[in-house]
Amino acid sequence: KQMKRRIINIASYEKPTFMKRIKGMTAFMLTAVLLLGFAPFISTYAADGSHYQWDSSSENISYVDLSTYFGEYEGSFVLYDLENDAWSIHDMEHATLRVAPNSTYKIYDALFGLEEDIITPENSFIAWNGETYPFEAWNADQTLQSAMNSSVNWYFQAVDEQLGASDVYSYVQEIGYGNENMSGDFSSYWMESSLEISPIEQVELLTKLQNNSFGFAPENINAVKDAICLSSSAAGTFYGK
């Protein structure tokens, strides 16, 4: 809840010239905020894949200073205006720094499971195996909606187990997910392990999800969007993970 409030506060920053542009948007807005409080600051782009080598020469980028909102944390804010093809970025260094996706990866893991009919939009039920987990919400049967809402790790690990490592890796490569490195343990490759992705790559993938540039079944795309919908009104829809 505290993290959610921080994200909302950053996204609603009210510098007039910035908000004037935000209020004029009618297209889908994509935001990705990664707080990297325990990640070391890297002053130059590394050649070892730790940074996304983004060719921004042809991009329309506005740099915003949101350091007041981050406080003692090091991190980034990346917003892409789909209608105007324009970026607003706080801290380019961290915006290209690849880190573990952790629960944000569940968006795509769910999509892979849907594409392979492990789960379907109509039936995404997976039974709890009876193992005791540290969060009460995890100790129950789950659907995609409940598993996404409570960020239930075992649900997505179960999807992976049914998919198999080879199929998961094929999908990771197909959509170009970050460094595409699944060399870590198969049960946790996306949790502080080998798979890493930068905030800018996260936003690029969210744009592809919105436009279904993947060419996946529209009903599967919509099922994932529904599962990560936080609120919706006449003003727009807010998604998050």
Give, region by region, the residue ranges found by the protein language model.
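Mid-domain, small-residue-enriched loop/turn segments at the edges of structured enzyme/sensor domains
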Residues: 143-144, 156-210
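A glycine-rich, coil/turn loop motif that links secondary-structure elements
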Residues: 97-100, 133-138, 185-197
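Short, well-structured active-site flanking segments
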Residues: 115-131, 217-221
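Cytosolic-facing loops and C-terminal tails of multi-pass membrane proteins
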Residues: 2-61
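Beta-lactamase-like hydrolase cores
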Residues: 46-95
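Active-site SXXK
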Residues: 99-123, 147, 202
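Acidic helix-start/capping segments at beta-turn-to-alpha-helix junctions
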Residues: 124-140, 146-152, 163-164
